[in-house]
Swiss-Prot record:
PANTHER family, alphabetized: NA(+)-TRANSLOCATING NADH-QUINONE REDUCTASE SUBUNIT A
Alphabetic keyword roster: Ion transport, NAD, Sodium, Sodium transport, Translocase, Transport, Ubiquinone
One GO MF term: oxidoreductase activity, acting on NAD(P)H, quinone or similar compound as acceptor
EC top class, as a word: translocase
Encoding gene per record: nqrA
Main function: NQR complex catalyzes the reduction of ubiquinone-1 to ubiquinol by two successive reactions, coupled with the transport of Na(+) ions from the cytoplasm to the periplasm. NqrA to NqrE are probably involved in the second step, the conversion of ubisemiquinone to ubiquinol.
Name used for this protein in its record: Na(+)-translocating NADH-quinone reductase subunit A
Database matches in InterPro entries: NqrA, NQRA_2nd, NqrA_C_domain, NQRA_N
Subunit structure: Composed of six subunits; NqrA, NqrB, NqrC, NqrD, NqrE and NqrF.
One GO BP: sodium ion transport
Its EC number(s): 7.2.1.1
Length: 446
């Protein structure tokens, strides 16, 4: 077992009840284009087209063969584009139950699958996009081969769902998915879970179960990869979350694309925080209807630390999101707030009374201060368990020095790995976008 000592479990109120219930009825779903790093779509549908579940909506021009399929049958009602014609979302109004079917196999046949059979089924169904590479966090090329594959069956994000509850509902499909992934390549498949967690796993020669313990980010794939099989500019691994593994298992055993999702609907502004069953790409305005408290709220697709604001053309559940978090918009300014004792405020440092409290806090979106230069007071080191020097790395990211940032380990990271550094930063700097700029530049320059 690998134990993480550095990190932070955010004391936020609104934790979900770990019981799965049906969410609100969803009549509209969407695929979000900006979730896929570096993707340039070649559209296969236009507004007004009627599509089946599993039908190709667009293909990646930069990565031929990687297709993105419809999560539901219905009519394409909108194709939203942003600045520079960047694809924001393809919206489908759900109608009917028509779907495209794919190859299916018996349990015995799963153990005899070839890598080519696995690739063909995953790519045809669009489930290939559930896999991501490290470094760069991109959907892998159709002919690429990883050194190893990481299955993340744990979660330490604030307000997260317990993977045990969800996996136990689909244990056979989860094991089938692990079997399929083990046939994808000859290297190791690492199943990463929390210490003593009841996560089923089949007896497969190249499956290795690893346990992690400690505060967040102990449950992030970046942490698992760093401690088990670190990457480099020439060494790539792939990773996938546990709910997508279940979807892979159902695809290969039933021949149908499974787009169901169990997400944590939680946060200080949620009336009844719990786990809800919904669909991939669900309209979050519909999912959160009558579920949130009065006031101006921000709905987040994903974690409060690293999720994306869901509004307008991107008001939908993300491809990789396992949470829907709701916070109050913190627009009110506090008179002389800097001099108050701050009993109802949380801080990692001993600057407010809330630091010494054991209670949970109603966090808002307020920054509690203005943006300024980096202040190296040791805050980053307290929440960074990886074997890197965070202050120097973050300085290089802010300065745009990609050579030094690469030497300090930025290739191992994704935006979510720096989310805690952003949270504790005295200068209120956003390090996720800076990391992405550096990674894009490194990849472009080779």
């Amino acid at each position: 077992m690998i134990t993480i000592k550095k990190g932070l479990n955010l004391p936020i109120s609104g934790s979900p009840e770990q019981v799965i219930r049906d969410g609100n009825a969803i009549t509209e779903v969407a695929l979000l284009g900006e979730e896929y790093v570096g993707m340039r779509p070649s559209m296969k549908v236009r507004e007004g087209d009627v599509v089946k579940k599993g039908q190709v909506l667009f293909e990646d021009k930069k990565n031929p063969g990687v297709v993105f399929t419809a999560p539901a049958s219905g009519t394409v009602t909108a194709i939203h584009r942003g600045a520079k014609r960047v694809l924001q979302s393809v919206v489908i109004k759900i109608e009917g139950n028509e779907q495209i079917t794919f190859e299916k196999y018996t349990t015995e046949q799963l153990n005899q699958l070839t890598s080519e059979q696995v690739r063909q089924n995953l790519q045809a169904s669009g489930l290939w996009t559930a896999l991501r590479t490290r470094p760069f966090s991109k959907v892998p090329a159709v002919d690429a081969t990883p050194v190893s594959i990481f299955v993340n069956a744990m979660d330490t994000n604030p307000l997260c769902a317990d993977p045990q509850v969800i996996v136990q509902q689909s244990a056979q499909a989860f094991e089938a998915g692990l079997t399929v992934l083990s046939r994808l390549h000859e290297g190791k498949v690492y199943l990463c879970k929390a210490a003593n967690a009841s996560i089923p796993s089949p007896s497969i020669a190249n499956l290795d179960v690893k346990e992690f313990a400690g505060p967040h980010p102990a449950g992030l794939s970046g942490t698992h990869i760093h401690f088990i099989d670190p990457v480099s500019a020439t060494k790539f691994v792939w990773y996938i979350n546990y709910q997508d593994v279940i979807a892979v298992g159902k695809l290969f055993t039933t021949g149908e694309l499974d787009v169901s999702r169990v997400v944590s609907l939680a946060g200080p502004q949620v009336k009844n925080p719990r786990l809800v069953r919904t669909v991939l790409g669900a309209n979050l305005s519909q999912l959160t209807a009558n579920e949130v408290k009065d006031g101006e709220n921000r709905v987040i697709s994903g974690s409060v630390l690293s999720g994306a604001k869901a509004a307008g053309p991107v008001d939908y559940l993300g491809r990789y999101a396992l949470q829907v978090s709701v916070l109050e918009e913190g627009r009110e300014k506090e008179f002389l707030g800097w001099i108050m004792p701050g009993a109802n405020k949380y801080s990692l440092s001993r600057t407010v009374l809330g630091h010494f409290s054991k209670k949970l806090f109603n966090f808002t979106t307020a920054l509690n201060g203005g943006e300024r230069a980096m202040v190296p007071i040791g805050a980053y080191e307290r929440v960074m368990p990886l074997d890197i020097i965070p202050t120097l790395l973050l300085r290089d990211l802010a300065a745009g020095d990609t050579d030094s940032a690469q030497a300090l380990g930025c290739l191992e990271l994704d935006e979510e790995d720096l989310a805690l550094c952003t949270f504790v930063c005295p200068g209120k700097n956003e390090y996720g976008p800076l990391l992405r700029q550096a990674l894009d530049k490194i990849e472009k320059e080779g």
